[in-house]
Amino acid sequence: MSKPETTAAPNFLRQIVQADLDAGKHAKIVTRFPPEPNGYLHIGHAKSICLNFGLAQEFAGDCHLRFDDTNPAKEDQEYIDAIEADIKWLGFQWSGEVCYASNYFDQLHAWAVELIKAGKAFVCDLGPEEMREYRGTLTEPGRNSPYRDRSVEENLDLFARMKAGEFPDGARSLRAKIDMGSPNMNLRDPILYRIRHAHHHQTGDKWCIYPSYDFTHGQSDAIEGITHSICTLEFEDHRPLYEWFLANLPVPAQPRQYEFSRLNLNYTVTSKRKLKQLVDEGHVSGWDDPRMSTLSGYRRRGYTPESIRNFCEMIGVNRASGVVDIGMLEFSIRDHLDATAPRAMCVLKPLKVVITNYPEGQVENLELPRHPKEDMGVRVLPFGRELFIDAGDFEEVPPAGYKRLIPGGEVRLRGSYVIRADEAIKDADGNIVELRCSYDPDTLGKNPEGRKVKGVIHWVPAEGSVECEVRLYDRLFRSANPEKAEEGGSFLDNINADSLQVLAGCRAEPSLGQANPEDRFQFEREGYFVADLKDSRPGKPVFNRTVTLRDSWGQG
């Protein structure tokens, strides 16, 4: 794709916050990031994290991390730990202690009782299917539940018995009494509490009734003094309900909800259900597989926090739905690593080269810059009689325009001498296993006299180079819209069978032998790579390809 503009795109919420502060509405702003701990954060969450934490930073406010933990059956401490780690990795720190919606269960219960006493909530015995029938449709109004007119006393008694664990899961629910004829489906007597006999990771077995997201969210914002409650556009229709609860309860503050468009990235799936399916069915190695759209996956792939933050700044914040080209994200990491990643050489498909006219036993220590522009110092490569080049850099019958090594032809070894291919040694099956070459001793750092050498290839010394594993990652899906499957198919049909190639026996220059996990490099002529967070260790490195040097997919 063409190079995107790197300047920040418009952010309408920044203007709203500035206007509120200028008008003296708030002494300081307080935002929050409220994930449900039922999965790992993905690239879409990064936009929300950067927005909420970024606004708080920019305007000297606070940003809370609050886990919306109202569904214990799907939540786990593993996800809580991973979410906290991802936020810190992105470069943000929440204000104060971590918050949990479950911290407010006692207060939420007390407010539910107040709604019952005010005649604004009732206990309903309809099951899920019946409730769906009574609810109506977008074009037809709903019908009142036959239990809507229960007395306050009966509702208080039933709700207390629900809390005491007297009824099985799903037998009853507590619903708000709003308007079954409302064109907004969310106002048709929404559920406030469900019976769910499930152990909770924070509150244990104290509760067997749990509040709904809608009943929890706005009141939690009010308790925490959130000034700007920012969520994605799918919650726009929930805002009237958010405001109804705040208007009908004695909450300590009146937060305001704002919506922005979620991040939709092509070639990508961000549905937690689908990501979990990829993991559970073994299509990927785990939530942090480098092909996943999770932040832990991008981290293991070699993406930097700076590149993701810059990407989120580039795409901006607005209310228009659209699809962002994944090429913008790939541009962002290329741009950052081009400026920061030290250069190194790694031969992915080694072919041995013997330089026949180089003195046996002689070794020259050649100094090559770690970076062409930045002052990162030098690394030392021992140059001797035997070395490795990539098998793809020699062709006996070259295609048109081939500028690498051919029989009788010359190339320059990066940072070293010009060599000529004199003889190809083959095994019994006709495979080339070794090249015999000669070098021009007068070409170190300069062109040979009277002839032009166009090609430059990378190499590593045979002695001192490090054997390593290289994992060539690519996009997990071959379709720009993975969700779009043929009739009877699924998004799994769009998985890219070539999204991972594992190469064993690669040879890396000596300086890479002591690479620590998450050390990043540009492998010259190959791409940007990172030492794997889990599997790589000094002396036995494993490198993951973060991204190719150039966009090999083009406009998707």
From Swiss-Prot:
Signal peptide start-end: none
Top-tier EC class: ligase
Gene3D superfamilies: Glutamyl-trna Synthetase, Domain 2, Glutamyl-tRNA Synthetase, Domain 3, HUPs, Ribosomal Protein L25, Chain P
UniProt-listed InterPro entries: aa-tRNA-synth_I_CS, Gln-tRNA-synth, Gln/Glu-tRNA_Ligase, Gln_tRNA_ligase_bac, Glu/Gln-tRNA-synth, Glu/Gln-tRNA-synth_Ib_cat-dom, Glu/Gln-tRNA-synth_Ib_codon-bd, Glu_tRNA_lig_a-bdl
UniProt short sequence motif 'KMSKS' region, positions renumbered to this chain: 269-273
SUPFAM superfamilies: Nucleotidylyl transferase, Ribosomal protein L25-like
GO cellular component: cytosol
One Gene Ontology molecular-function label: glutamine-tRNA ligase activity
Biological process according to GO: glutaminyl-tRNA aminoacylation; glutamyl-tRNA aminoacylation
Positions contributing to L-glutamine binding: 68, 213
Motif position, 'HIGH' region: 35-45
Keywords: Aminoacyl-tRNA synthetase, ATP-binding, Cytoplasm, Ligase, Nucleotide-binding, Protein biosynthesis
Cysteine disulfide partners in this protein: none
Localization per Swiss-Prot or TrEMBL: Cytoplasm
Residue positions binding ATP: 36-38, 42-48, 232, 262-263
Catalytic activity: tRNA(Gln) + L-glutamine + ATP = L-glutaminyl-tRNA(Gln) + AMP + diphosphate
Matches recorded under PROSITE patterns: AA_TRNA_LIGASE_I (PS00178)
CDD domains: GlnRS_core
EC id: 6.1.1.18
Keyword Ribonucleoprotein: no
Subunit structure: Monomer.
Similarity comment text for this entry: Belongs to the class-I aminoacyl-tRNA synthetase family.
Protein name: Glutamine--tRNA ligase
